[in-house]
Swiss-Prot record:
Belongs to the NadD family. One of its GO terms (molecular function) is nicotinate-nucleotide adenylyltransferase activity. It comes from the Bacteria. InterPro entries: Cyt_trans-like, NadD/NMNAT, Rossmann-like_a/b/a_fold. Its EC number is 2.7.7.18. This is Probable nicotinate-nucleotide adenylyltransferase. It catalyses: nicotinate beta-D-ribonucleotide + ATP + H(+) = deamido-NAD(+) + diphosphate. Catalyzes the reversible adenylation of nicotinate mononucleotide (NaMN) to nicotinic acid adenine dinucleotide (NaAD). GO terms for biological process: NAD biosynthetic process. Keywords: ATP-binding, NAD, Nucleotide-binding, Nucleotidyltransferase, Pyridine nucleotide biosynthesis, Transferase. It comes from Bradyrhizobium sp. (strain BTAi1 / ATCC BAA-1182). The keyword NAD applies.
Amino acid sequence: MRIGLLGGSFNPPHQAHRAISLFALKRLQLDRVWWLVTPGNPLKDNGGLHALAERAAAARKVAADPRIEISCLESVIGTRYTADTIDYLRRRASRLRFVWIMGADNLAQFHRWQKWQHIAAQVPMAVVDRPPRSFRALNAPAARALARYRLPEADAGRLADRAAPAWVYLTGLKLSLSSTGLRNPDGSWKSI
């Protein structure tokens, strides 16, 4: 089974998360996408972060597709770091083929993630274009360091079968929604 992993705070979850997941299911020929709702992002101020249970419940409503599953795995295993989560999944579910899915905004700062090289060496990655961040993302330190492992977009459907490091940059999905834009100044959520 081919599983896409979309990690995030989901504070709040929104239709762009759903659209990215449906896009990835099709373009990467995945069977499922798991939304990994993190207890907290180590690179962000988590002061306005809603309760994990609230974010997970909202994510279930937004996902609205049986192929998208919501998980609070990081809370269960006691981590906030993607590298730990991927190591855990690879040990516990070695028969599954995982692909890490992230937006271009995350690729632009991927070099700041704990053990980012380890993540890239453990699981193939799909980066979804987020205009106008494309140029910055593709010229970021991690993108340059991993450039030789980038596959042509036409090979996206075979990414889950590739050994890491391998990644693809997916274009064609133009979304401007962001969780930041859906939060009020007091941290409460606008209508999702």
